[in-house]
Amino acid sequence: MTKQKIAVLGPGSWGTALAQVLNDNGHEVRLWGNVVEQIEEINTNHTNQRYFKDITLDSKIKAYTNLEEAINNVDSILFVVPTKVTRLVAKQVANLLKHKVVLMHASKGLEPGTHERLSTILEEEISEQYRSDIVVVSGPSHAEEAIVRDITLITAASKDIEAAKYVQKLFSNHYFRLYTNTDVVGVETAGALKNIIAVGAGALHGLGYGDNAKAAIITRGLAEITRLGVQLGADPLTFSGLSGVGDLIVTGTSVHSRNWRAGDALGRGEKLEDIEKNMGMVIEGISTTKVAYEIAQNLNVYMPITEAIYKSIYEGANIKDSILDMMSNEFRSENEWH
């Protein structure tokens, strides 16, 4: 692939890691953020200490606070901003974009209030005149591992397979590999909902439960993610792939996962506001729990784990009691998809 110009919007841990992958592939990478000190640090010291204490970035990665400069004459734009500000940033991009680009996002969440997936937000806010079909970049990927060039396999999903193939080539190298998929609904739903299950898995650990319980919540969590995804129009096979079970494993079993760590702290009795303050990073699973619970209620989809986490976070229920209550739920077949 010839050298591309790419704007990466969001200099968080994942945005920074993806910027480095793209830079390793010989592309011109422009990293955009709105914290002046952070942008100056990246440009001057080639570090992003808030997220990576011991990593030096390539000096060719340039950071910007001016969005217009960052997206000027680029071939593609990658959104890696928190879910809650995706629409705001998309509106800003729409007002500045003067040419057609390949539009990608690598965030995982559902918009509070509207319940919309992030690709839908981008479609609504940025005219088709100036973008490709949205490409979703998602899968089992800790930024802490990708940044040190550990082997990572994820998915590029788009309704337009050619756009997905473009992104596949854009990112893939000897340590980072993408597979294509056309099931955007499934890939985005899996990526968002696995954060809820990761909170639950972390809570089990914090409560002192063992591997049996953790395996149970991950497996049954996958079942309810699939149930809701299918109701939303997803292909059930997607949930057995990288963006489904793969992402669920990596997020639901690792201390690298901020959602798992948040659940662990909840299980140990810490208050949510203290957890969010101490972590200093967005915990997407918290807001996604509320959105997923509301969608499940509207569609009458059975999601007992999501409901238990919701009641613990938003209704003040005891996390241990909420989890144990699931053990007395009505008996069901393992393969019920409704």
Curated annotation (Swiss-Prot):
Origin superkingdom: Bacteria
HAMAP family (UniProt xref): NAD_Glyc3P_dehydrog (MF_00394)
Gene source species: Streptococcus agalactiae serotype V (strain ATCC BAA-611 / 2603 V/R)
Record localization: Cytoplasm
The protein's name: Glycerol-3-phosphate dehydrogenase [NAD(P)+]
GO terms for MF: glycerol-3-phosphate dehydrogenase [NAD(P)+] activity; NAD binding
Pfam families linked to this entry: NAD_Gly3P_dh_C, NAD_Gly3P_dh_N
Active site: 194 (proton acceptor)
Binding-site list for NADPH: 13-14, 108, 143, 258, 282, 284
Catalytic activity field: sn-glycerol 3-phosphate + NAD(+) = dihydroxyacetone phosphate + NADH + H(+); sn-glycerol 3-phosphate + NADP(+) = dihydroxyacetone phosphate + NADPH + H(+)
Main EC class the enzyme belongs to: oxidoreductase
Gene3D superfamilies tied to this protein: N-(1-d-carboxylethyl)-l-norvaline Dehydrogenase, domain 2, NAD(P)-binding Rossmann-like Domain
Pathway: Membrane lipid metabolism; glycerophospholipid metabolism
GO biological process, one term: symbiont-mediated suppression of host chemokine signal transduction pathway
Family: Belongs to the NAD-dependent glycerol-3-phosphate dehydrogenase family.
InterPro entries: 6-PGluconate_DH-like_C_sf, 6PGD_dom2, G3P_DH_NAD-dep, G3P_DH_NAD-dep_C, G3P_DH_NAD-dep_N, NAD(P)-bd_dom_sf
Record function comment: Catalyzes the reduction of the glycolytic intermediate dihydroxyacetone phosphate (DHAP) to sn-glycerol 3-phosphate (G3P), the key precursor for phospholipid synthesis.
